[in-house]
Amino acid sequence: MKAYQESVNKYGSSTTLPKQAATGRFYTKKIDGRWWLVDPEGCLHLERSATSLRKGTSSRNKTAWNSKFGTDEKWLSTTQRELSEIGFHGTGAFCTGTYSLIQTHNASNPSSPLTLAPSFAFLSQFKSAKSYNYPGGSDDNAAGLVFYNGWTEWCELYLAGSAFADYLRDPNVLGFFSDNEINFSSNSSRILDRFLAISNSSDPAYVAAKAFMDSKGTQSVTDDLNNEFAGIVAEKYYKAVKEAVKKVDDKLLYLGTRLHGTPKYMEGVVRAAGKYCDVISINYYSRWSPELTTAIADWANWADKPFLVSEFYTKGVEDSDLNNQSGAGYSVPTQNERAYAYQHFTLGLLEAKNCIGWHWFKYQDDDGTDNSSKPANKGLYDNSYQLFPYLSFFARELNFNAYDLIQYFDK
């Protein structure tokens, strides 16, 4: 552990790799064909964090929290230390109720911060602010709201308002996610088909889809046309957010919308994200290994921007007291296999020159009534706030050697 701690700074960034310009903020840079994050001190940074850092709500969560911590500062100080001792140095999406506590911790402990990557829900917030309904009455069509009156102007107001005020110009904020898993299409439902099926012919989403088809001179939706239209929708979404960001804090990294499922394989969507996002975030499930020669190569070609794995995990089913009936992560027999899967998957990510890191989903296991009473073994921590020993050991071995492994892969 000492060797690792001496080779990284407070952000977990390398102090031995060539230093870059220090701007006081995180930014991205491509060096010799590999994408990097550069931290506020100018050190090259590989992102390794955990999502959903928040207090558990079950009775045993509360009992354990009170026994082990008792105060927010002890909780976060202990958590920061324990995570950094296994090579995790920050937080990701869904830290509901904790972001302000993390910032308070960071202000009191400037030498041992937890980075933040707060997540928002722009589309649903826009819908509520404007008292709109979802296009066609379905939240599957939420992306169609970008065609509704006021989208661009609302993004500017939202980013300039109270929701973002605490994060602007904070050096410990890696960046932000504007939404989660927007349904630009799925295996069973193409966005162009959905919009064309809206019964209200004056609905702006329907109007946009109809105009697109008219411009193509056809009434038959194909996968290629759907991909092109999805890209148009995505570009209208991302452009509004990015232009609003530039007006309030042009150094705040825009981490995209955590593409998942079908959208992450759609050229039109990824190209649009690459045009306006600083980092393309990917919730990476349904694969045991990163798709180095296919999807990951495509992302590099389509976007010319780095990607961040914003979610991945496996759950152990034989040695967990949870029913494990929820979640997109693969099931494995035990905690041992969770550990092996972590190393296997992240080794593949280290090999990818367009990957700038990952966020494990998530900080702590589900419990109690989580996920409609279908809790699952997703956490680095169990429900008593104890790190899973085998998973944390194997994660530490990989995380501590990550910078050396990158140099090995880049030879």
Task: Give residue spans per PLM region.
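Short, acidic/polar
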Residues: 72-83, 156-162, 262-273, 291-293, ...
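Loop/turn elements at helix/coil->beta-strand transitions in domains of secreted/extracellular proteins
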Residues: 33-34, 43, 84-93, 109-117, ...
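Aromatic-rich peripheral "rim/lid" segments of glycoside hydrolase catalytic domains that contact
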Residues: 193-202, 361-411
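Glycoside hydrolase catalytic-domain groove-lining segments
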Residues: 218, 228-243, 247-327, 347
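Substrate-binding cleft of secreted/luminal carbohydrate-active enzymes
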Residues: 92, 173-175, 180, 310-312, ...
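Active-site clefts of carbohydrate-active enzymes
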Residues: 128-144, 221-223, 261, 266-267, ...
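Polysaccharide-binding and catalytic clefts of secreted carbohydrate-active enzymes
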Residues: 40, 139-146, 166-268
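Active-site-adjacent substrate/metal-binding segments within catalytic domains
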Residues: 1-110, 125-175, 220, 224-232
